[in-house]
């Protein structure tokens, strides 16, 4: 398998991943502030040779430093002589390295806590905490804590129960936090990260959509050369922006956009996608009608991971079949893989527990005949949207709600059948249309319907019914790493529920999912 991955910048903050599901959130916050940041495996034997770190952040993680098998700091981290900020497990690694001691806490501390800083740390001499309140709310998630401070470090912040929550080195630009500044619940976390960039690393704030676009276009031209590219399009924002980037960089004549109709699309999706791609100026748009192939392969399959693997495998096989069956010599396969896709599939090899496989990165065969070109692999969803706007894509395309690569297969719990797909398509269409008509569509980051494997008793007229249940989900997010519940009025939800039951045969009950991410993921499977 050949990965051609665009690195949009060659300098910034290097984030070492020790298995935390918040790792990419650190990266996202840094980019929001205006500096490029990149994640590598915390166990890497050496730093990237083509990336200059202005500073280093050590992520949290599920390990205990007291375990012999726990991941440790590589020696090169200190040899680089760059500022270091350890977060949670990252702080505990620093405690161990400098000769301190850790202990297992009485219980895992998870949730909001109060941080009490030493007053001198928020003044001009306290670069990391400059301008912040002495007392503030932070987000804790740890099992171990400091039993004895290293001689070279000083505790500058504690929680209300006396746990060391912040420490700094006496002479070096090294600090540790026992809380997560990257999480929104840490009320001054973003300011702290900006202080680390500006005051500690002395790094430039120069990361924006303009630099993203220029670097990505340059990379595509350099990596693809004079070859032709086959772009795998799903109709979502990611693959559409990837196709537009490739066409912009190479010229539309060298780019063929292929949309695989898996039979797992939303209502009227196929015609909408084909027309949208042509409106982008792409001269070569092909639709592969593969519905029967996918439905046959998914027959009887109920495990969500198995569904994703099957879809991912067939997805690639269909594009390979198309490429080898045509005279044009495609050497590259373009995909809209995003950074969160990679991290949720543990694609960095950093040991983060796999939450779910993504069809772009989890179902690829080991011997892929086409070289992968993934222009968005280092970018987040909102950054992809920014690039789309920069390229002049229509707002209704750029601002379209995210849609998973496996399509409705991960929104049908249980077996996939033509009948169940029809029910879900119709229910989802009612929900989305209502959001648009009532002006809520652009207030919500993502909304969709889910078909549950549950039937319930109902009554219609004088007759008893025993029919399917639809769950509605609406969330707000910026990067898909965390998500809050969409604040839709109960009157609106009642209206949608009534409309679905009335218009969609086979459904007699509608429920609303009010779970955040975490603990849930956005999609149900």
What are these regions (language model features)?
Residues 1-58, 62-68, 78-80, 96-327, ...:
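RNA-binding accessory domains that recognize and position tRNA/RNA substrates
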Residues 69-73:
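Active-site loop/oxyanion-hole signature of alpha/beta-hydrolase fold enzymes
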Residues 76-90:
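Short alpha-beta junction capping motif
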Residues 86, 90, 95, 235:
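Gly/Ala-rich beta-loop-alpha elbow adjacent to hydrolase catalytic centers
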């Amino acid at each position: 398998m050949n990965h051609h991955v665009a690195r949009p910048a060659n300098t910034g903050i290097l984030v070492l991943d020790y298995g935390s599901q918040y790792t990419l959130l650190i990266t996202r916050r840094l980019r929001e502030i205006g500096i490029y940041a990149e994640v590598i495996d915390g166990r890497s034997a050496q730093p990237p040779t083509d990336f200059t770190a202005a500073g280093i952040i050590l992520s949290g993680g599920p390990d205990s430093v007291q375990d012999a098998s726990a991941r440790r700091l590589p020696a090169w981290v200190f040899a680089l002589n760059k500022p270091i900020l350890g977060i949670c497990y990252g702080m505990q690694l620093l405690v161990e390295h400098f000769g301190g001691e850790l202990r297992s806490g009485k219980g895992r501390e998870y949730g909001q806590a109060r941080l009490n800083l030493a007053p001198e740390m928020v003044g001009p001499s306290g670069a990391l905490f400059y301008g912040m309140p002495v007392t503030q709310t932070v987000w804790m998630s740890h099992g171990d804590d400091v039993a004895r401070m290293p001689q070279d470090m000083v505790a500058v912040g504690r929680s209300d129960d006396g746990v060391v929550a912040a420490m700094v080195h006496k002479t070096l630009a090294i600090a540790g936090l026992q809380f997560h500044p990257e999480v929104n619940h840490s009320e001054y976390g973003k300011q702290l990260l900006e202080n680390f960039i500006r005051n500690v690393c002395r790094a430039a704030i120069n990361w924006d959509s303009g630099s993203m676009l220029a670097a990505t276009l340059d990379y595509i031209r350099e990596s693809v050369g004079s070859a032709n590219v086959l772009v795998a399009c799903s109709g979502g924002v990611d693959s559409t922006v990837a196709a537009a980037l490739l066409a912009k960089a190479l010229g539309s004549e060298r780019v063929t956009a292929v949309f695989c109709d898996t039979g797992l699309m939303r209502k009227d999706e196929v015609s909408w996608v084909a027309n949208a791609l042509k409106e982008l100026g792409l001269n070569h748009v092909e639709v592969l009608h593969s519905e029967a192939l996918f439905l046959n392969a998914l027959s009887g399959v109920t495990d969500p991971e198995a569904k994703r693997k099957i879809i991912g495998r067939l997805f690639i096989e269909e594009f390979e079949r198309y490429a080898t069956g045509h005279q044009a010599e495609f050497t590259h396969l373009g995909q809209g893989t995003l950074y969160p896709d990679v991290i949720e599939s543990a694609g960095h090899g950093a040991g983060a527990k796999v939450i779910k496989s993504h069809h772009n990165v989890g179902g690829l065969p080991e011997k892929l005949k086409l070289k992968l070109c993934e222009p968005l692999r280092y970018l987040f969803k909102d950054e992809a949207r920014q690039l789309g706007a920069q390229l002049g894509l229509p707002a209704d395309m750029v601002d379209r709600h995210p849609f998973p690569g496996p399509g409705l297969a991960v929104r049908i719990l249980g077996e996939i059948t033509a009948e169940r797909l029809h029910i879900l398509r119709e229910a989802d269409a009612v929900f989305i249309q209502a959001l648009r008509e009532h002006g809520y569509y652009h207030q919500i980051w993502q909304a969709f319907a889910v078909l549950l494997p549950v039937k319930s008793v109902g009554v219609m007229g004088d007759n008893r019914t025993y029919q399917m249940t639809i769950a509605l989900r609406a969330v707000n997010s910026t990067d898909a790493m965390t998500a809050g519940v969409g604040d839709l009025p109960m009157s609106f939800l009642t209206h949608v529920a009534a409309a679905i039951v009335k218009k969609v045969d086979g459904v007699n009950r509608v429920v609303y999912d009010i779970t955040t991410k975490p603990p849930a993921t956005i999609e149900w499977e």
